[in-house]
Amino acid sequence: MELAQIQVRLRECISQSQYSQRQIAKAIGVSAQTISKYMKQNIFPAPDTLSKLCMLLDVRADYILGLTNEY
């Protein structure tokens, strides 16, 4: 899956969550600016950050990465 498609899924999961970007950033140990970059620029979270993000958002990393369509 291309990075642009991964960003779409990541943006979708973050937007549908009950958390603000600032809350997500604080919970996973990055800046709110970094969350914004994940959503809008060609920047992808490090594996450990992706893991924390998926746990917080209750979504499978396989879904974000496009390996499955199961949320």
Language-model segment annotations:
Residues 1, 18, 65-71:
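Short, charged recognition helix plus adjacent turn
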Residues 1-19:
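A short, Lys/Arg-rich alpha-helix, primarily the initiator
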Residues 22, 33, 62:
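Key DNA-contact positions within bacterial/archaeal DNA-binding proteins
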Residues 24-25, 53:
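Short alpha-helical "recognition helix" segments of helix-turn-helix
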Residues 29-44:
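Recognition helix of helix-turn-helix/homeodomain-like DNA-binding domains
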Residues 39, 57, 65-68:
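DNA major-groove recognition helix of helix-turn-helix
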Residues 48-63:
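DNA major-groove recognition helix of helix-turn-helix/homeodomain DNA-binding modules
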